[in-house]
């Protein structure tokens, strides 16, 4: 749901999101949520599904600590962190201090939001290592440990314990 440029089709976006959630539950698939200037709207759509097996990722999360904590209310939702965390004025390093490492995934928003030191270039998957290094520093872990936790949990629920 994207309300950054235009709120004209909010009702339609909400109906489509409801349908996608219905399909996700029916087929046991995750939802990937694009949330831009629309957190409260998405949260209100998700709230009735809180006690269901719905799972997903808040892709390209750039929200507040409060919003991140509200996402944590949904046991099977992850927060997608990309190059924004490396930006000088990013608030994500502070936000992440309240979020368990096990609840984030590293991602790109390619071709956008290229992490420092490549900011200004077209983003690509190879640059996720820069996001990884930044996140490792925030959590006080090695990049290898962060890679293991954030990658394995995407595919299996108990991989971080290995």
Label each residue range with its predicted role.
Residues 20, 132, 156:
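Aromatic/hydrophobic pocket-lining residues that form π-stacking "cages" and hydrophobic walls in ligand
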Residues 155-161:
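Conserved small/polar residues in nucleotide/adenosyl-binding loops
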Residues 90:
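Conserved catalytic/ligand-binding micro-motifs in nucleotide and anionic cofactor chemistry
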Residues 102-110:
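Non-cysteine beta-strand/loop elements that form the S-adenosyl-L-methionine
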